[in-house]
């Protein structure tokens, strides 16, 4: 079966594993998914990311992060730009998520960036997802 939206699949896998408090999960790899996972790690939403080569497309292993009392670090994940309705933002219209408590992930001409990085570099692009 052909997957029409691999980014939504990745976010759903993370959301589902987070809801049942799994320690780790595996996602089929792609370059864009790898960059999104690196952003989530850099911003402190996940604990670690491993990239496993398997002579096919590879696997991304994501280690989820929880607080002291096993509370979730990721409260929500939302796919914004979908295959049926693409959402773009100009450099001066980059969205803020929960007044800066969350992040927006954008695909720009300068690579995959968070909303803060896109504002600093004055780059617009496709709004992939919100994470808070």
Swiss-Prot record:
Keyword annotations of the record: Ribonucleoprotein, Ribosomal protein, RNA-binding, rRNA-binding
GO biological process: translation
InterPro entries from the UniProt entry: Ribosomal_uS8 (IPR000630), Ribosomal_uS8_CS (IPR047863), Ribosomal_uS8_sf (IPR035987)
Cellular component terms per the entry's GO annotation: ribonucleoprotein complex; ribosome
Superkingdom of the source species: Bacteria
Signal sequence, start to end: none
Chain coiled-coil ranges: none
Any one GO MF annotation of this record: rRNA binding
Pfam families reported in the protein's UniProt record: Ribosomal_S8
Assembly: Part of the 30S ribosomal subunit. Contacts proteins S5 and S12.
Family membership noted in the UniProt record: Belongs to the universal ribosomal protein uS8 family.
Function: One of the primary rRNA binding proteins, it binds directly to 16S rRNA central domain where it helps coordinate assembly of the platform of the 30S subunit.
Protein name in UniProt: Small ribosomal subunit protein uS8
Native source species: Bacillus licheniformis (strain ATCC 14580 / DSM 13 / JCM 2505 / CCUG 7422 / NBRC 12200 / NCIMB 9375 / NCTC 10341 / NRRL NRS-1264 / Gibson 46)
